[in-house]
Structure formats: C-alpha cells, structure tokens
Amino acid sequence: MESKAFNKPKVELHVHLDGSIKPETIIHFAKKRQIKLPADTVEGLLEHVSYKEPLSLTEFLQKFNHYMPAIAGDREAIKRIAYEFVEMKAKEGVIYVEVRYSPHFLANSKVDPIPWGQKEGDITPDEVVDLVNQGLRKGEKTFNIKARSILCCMRHMPNWSSEVIELCKKYQNDTVVAIDLAGDESLNCESYPGHRKAYEEAVKCGIHRTVHAGEVGPPSVVKEAVEVLKAERIGHGYHTTEDPNLYKELLENNMHFEVCPWSSYLTSACHPDFTKHPATQFRKDKANFSLNTDDPLIFGSTLDVDYSIAVQHMGFTEDEFKRVNINAAKSSFLPDNEKKELLYKLYEAYGMILSTGL
C-alpha cells in the first residue's frame, strides 16, 4: 500500500475517472490515433495538465481540453482508463471506490454537442457506460478491490440529464450506483429544470443521489441540492458552514460531505491556509465526511497527499482516519448486504471487531 499517512484500507467516494488517467495512456492513444497533444513526453504533458499552485475552477477545467481528445471516442481507451483506475486505487490501499464520470464527455455519437471537437463517430453514451463497466469489472478481478460508478449530469448541459438517469436505471445492477450533478454552480436548477426532472426520476426509481455543491458556490447551492434534488451526499460542501442554520440541519441529519482537501486548495475553493479549512470544522463537529482525491492526474496527487494534509495541517489522528473511512463506508451507495461486508472488512483491518461471546 502506498499511503503513509494512513497505512490501512480506505474507502474513496469522490474521484473523477477523466481526472485520473495515466499520462502514459494519454500519450499512447494520442500517438495511435494521431491526435496532437501539447507535448509527447510524460514530463512535458504534465507541465500542461498538472499544476501545484491555486488556479480558478474555470482555469482548472480548461486542463481537460489538453488530453480528453486522445481518450474520448475510442473503445480501447475508455476500457483501459477504467481498468487502470482500479489498479491505481488498489495501489493506494483503497478497498472500495465510487468513481464518477459523464458518459457524454467520452462519447462521439448521439451526443449534442459532440465534445472536445471530435468528429462524429459511433460510440454513444450508452456504450461508454458499458465499456467503463467492463474495465472496472476486469480491474476488480485483477486487483481484488470493489469499484462502483456514478454517472454525472453537467450543469451546463441539462439536455443530457434525462439520458443520464435512464443509463443509471439501465446499468443499476452493473457497477452504476448513483447519479451526480457537476459543473458551474451558478447555473441553478430553477433555470435548468432538466436536472430536477432527472433527480425526481432517481428518487422514484431508488437511484442514489450526490451533487457537487458549495465547492466554490454559496450555501444556497447546497440547500437546493438537499431540498430540490434530494441529495443524499454533498460533493465538497465547504461553503455550507457559512450558513449556520443549514450547516446545523445537515449535521443533525448526518449528511455526508465528500471532502477533497488538496483539490480545494488548487481550485481556490477554500482559504489557502489548511488550518482554516472547513474540514477542520467538520472534524471538530464530528460531521459525517470522507477524504478524497477528486482529480489526481491534474492535481499531481494520490490519496496519501490528502491524508498527509489532514495529518500535518489539521491534526487528524489514526483513530479519526478510521472514523472517516467507516463513515465513508456507511455513506457509500452499496446495497445494505455489501455495505455490511465492507464495514466488516474495515472493522477487522482496524482491530475493531468486538467479541460477541459466540
């Protein structure tokens, strides 16, 4: 296991597939498909796609333009990034991961507009999900960890959301466990009812729900996620603490916050001083939250970076890390029987199995 700050089994709930691709894989498919990259060595490519000092969220999102054309619209590439993702997480000591992505961003057919300036091809969002599932399942068998997926709606593309929820339903028993909403938080659901309708359908069909909210946006976005979209978890949620009443209500309801410390620094989502990070407040209040990488390719990170920040700047102890991972497992979108199995694995690894006297 790679992690040094917490060298025990971990659970990760907030990480993007398209932000977790190996640079070598990007270069391989760019060459194979004759797609021009900003550089053709790993070091050169990382200079363009990875960074270490805070940028705005918009500048961060522009990083994807450099490399996604090499991966999107290629069956082998889509399967491979899913497989290699599981390999990467296994090396980090993760035993259960929920990975999220927008099927439309990897497609080149039956998607409007076609992303990344691709020519029209024959890979639909539906086939993308099937390809990712194949890669994840193969990775699970090879690396002996459990991986599930979350399909993302994009705030600026409400016309995609009805298909996202249909794909969640179609693949509900085949790695897909939930729906997510990502993108520009200033685009609310009042103006873009496509998302609200998709989430209403999710509630009706028993599909789990998480929403990116309060990352750079105000607490009102979190409120909308909970009240309108019926979110069961909040992606990031840092700015929730600015509305004491909302924060108190979410604490009382045991709402789970998917916290990504290093990401929040590099996207300027939070104060650059980690001692002032909302996670320190969450920790103090014994809130329900997890620690996650978000986009490790772009942030040049592993899960150990986030755990190290929590130790060095926020004073987290090993017992608190155990609690964080147990909360992550409890808040995972696994069916109850699989959740119990996961929790048992953690309790066992953490030396927390109590003798029942049987």
Swiss-Prot record:
Site (Important for catalytic activity): H236
Cellular component terms (Gene Ontology): anchoring junction; cytoplasmic vesicle lumen; cytosol; external side of plasma membrane; lysosome
Subcellular location: Cell membrane; Cell junction; Cytoplasmic vesicle lumen; Cytoplasm
Catalytic activity: adenosine + H2O + H(+) = inosine + NH4(+); 2'-deoxyadenosine + H2O + H(+) = 2'-deoxyinosine + NH4(+)
Active site: E215 (proton donor)
Cofactor note: Binds 1 zinc ion per subunit.
Main location: membrane
Topology in membrane: Peripheral membrane protein
Annotated residues for binding of Zn(2+): H14, H16, H212, D294
Protein name according to UniProt: Adenosine deaminase
Species in which this protein is naturally found: Xenopus laevis (African clawed frog)
Source lineage: Eukaryota, Metazoa, Chordata, Craniata, Vertebrata
